[in-house]
Amino acid sequence: MSPRRLAWLAAFALIAASCGGGSSSPSSPSTPTTPTTPTTPTPPATSACSAIGGVAGTIQGITNGTSCSLATSAVVKLNMKDSGGQTVGGCSGTVIDRRAVLTAAHCLVGEVSSVQVFQGTGATIASASFSAHPSYSHTSSGSSGLDIGVVITATDLDRTPVPLLFSRDARVGEQAVVAGWGQDENGSSSGLLKAGTTSISNVASTWLEAAASMTSVNVCSGDSGGPLLLSEGGAWALGGVTSATSGGAYCNSGTSYFANLRHPDAQSFISRLVPGLTSK
């Protein structure tokens, strides 16, 4: 089954061994890097919320996925509007500066004329501008290029920005935290922010991959643009952006794909648009 893009259905939920959504496939990754023994211990599912700046809440029918407090997390929900003000899609994103959100390129192309940022509480914040990486291209047969984009907001975001991991490659076998607002394994969009853990199964120049298992989470419709976090120097940093999955209708199998922020073209694109970002 071809990997599917994860935009639409309003948000990014991170799910446990069961969610995968979207449409079309990323281009074939380049040769994987040599596996390296990971040094980061597996964070328990209940600690995943703290990795994204939230507080763990009740598990809402998601295997290994924990619902998180909305009041403090840097993982936000994006609603895309067309020129007539109609909603044309929904994604997740991560606050990386006081007025900047990192998300997926495929969330920002097509009919999108404006973006509304919802922090989980309070009013939405309008975009001042948004940009998809210029290398990104999508056709009926698949997509290519770096699936990353940046939303610049009109006013400050009330969240602590997440640093980006620019200094090293992800490692095969390394544990990671993913989070978002999308569908769960029952095909339900609960409107909850969720987080959980997974493991890196492949590393390529433009893509990171994580295979679904009974002990890991998987991503689903609405999860596009959300973070893949890696531990560095005792803190969590943004190493990838959720892009696509090869999972089935209930997001319970296959491989999830994340744009690799280690790629120099990704780093130069983000740094140009967000000169004040913090990296590790």
Regions found by a protein language model. Give the residues of each.
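A conserved glycine-rich beta-strand in the N-terminal activation segment of trypsin-fold
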Residues: V75-R98, S143
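Sec-dependent bacterial lipoprotein signal peptides
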Residues: M1-A17
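C-terminal subregion of chymotrypsin/trypsin-like serine protease catalytic domains
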Residues: C19-P35, P43, A48-A51, A56, ...
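Acidic glycine-/aspartate-rich tracts in secreted/extracellular proteins
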Residues: D82-G84, H106-G110, T121-A123, A154-R159, ...
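Short conserved beta-strand and strand-loop elements enriched in small hydrophobics
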Residues: V76-N79, S113-A123, E174-G180, L230
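Chymotrypsin/trypsin-fold serine protease catalytic domain
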Residues: S144-N218, G222, E232, S253-Y257, ...
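Conserved catalytic-core segment of clan PA serine endopeptidases
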Residues: A56-L70, V109, S113-R159, L165-R168, ...
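N-terminal activation segment of mature serine protease catalytic domains
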Residues: P44-Q86
